[in-house]
Amino acid sequence: LGFCSGSKGDPIFQEDFGSGNGTGNPLAAGVTNYTYVVGDPQDGQYTISDQISQQINTWHNALPNTTASNGRALVVNADYTAGLFYQTPISGLCENASYEFSAYLMNIFNSSTGACPGTGIPINVRFEIWNATDTQLLKQGSTGDIAGSSNAFWEQYAMTFQSQAGQNSIILKMFNNSDGGCGNDLAIDDIIFRSCGDLTTISPINSSENEISICEENLPQTINLEANPDFSIYSDHYYQWQRSNDGETWNDIPGANQAQFSTSSISTDTYFRVQVAEDPVNLDDNLCSTFSEAFYVEVIPTPPTPSS
């Protein structure tokens, strides 16, 4: 397992199991092979809730609000046989694009109760990615053992994946990779699948500045900018420069598709950013590419001439 070390796009898929207090609705048929219950689940069962340790007093008595969504979670009492915690199909992938599959996990056994030897049977979750027909395992990775603790805490785990030419759909899966018994009880939250790309900065050529201020009396001016990807993910780089007057609404600059870019004459406050993809076709989809932080060009007004 490992995180995207570059820039992360908006989630293509996110499962946060809902908000609100108490127990939520069961998962759709086929999502898990565990059995839904209201209240604390026993071996082979699960619930959707923001509350745990209602009947089982060896669990932590609350889920910490430290995930992305801070709502309900999938709470599972893992079985003696390896079971499927969760699966979902993902469509709309771009070809030759990098992605990150992540989730927050928590061992809910409270080791300070002493109910199990040591820290109890650890939880261990296997992440898998399958092709759209569920016939070929494309990638897998395991968290390793996550021991019970006297303190309740979430920890995020992730796996990266690169789609192939013509591949636009996959299936995400999460499996029990440990043994049933005293322990191996867990909560899962915020399962996210998102694009992953290089972290790219913009600077003037031969400079490291991330913004420029220009006095109004020196206008108009042209600035030579350069995109600086960190090469953490992409092996090839394709660019589309954009500009904005407010830093929120962006427009493509026709023909600006190289790492270096010379602005047209600037006469007012302007923002620039660059969209980066590993395949040129992915520049047409914001979910399959990444964006740099904005580069700001500030125009400083000329102060009024003092009156005599």
Regions found by a protein language model. Name each.
Residues 242-244, 273-277:
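Conserved Ser/Thr-centered positions that define the repeating blades of beta-propeller domains
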Residues 219-229:
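A short beta-strand segment in extracellular, disulfide-stabilized domains
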Residues 179-182, 277-288:
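Short, solvent-exposed loop/turn segments at the edges of extracellular beta-sandwich modules
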Residues 194-201, 293-306:
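Extracellular interdomain linker/stem segments of modular secreted and single-pass surface proteins
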Residues 2-94, 105-108, 114-126, 133, ...:
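Aromatic (Trp/Tyr/Phe) and Gly/Pro-enriched flexible surface segments
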Residues 99, 168-170, 268-272:
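Exposed beta-strand face motif in extracellular beta-rich ectodomains
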Residues 229-243:
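Solvent-exposed loop segments of extracellular immunoglobulin-like
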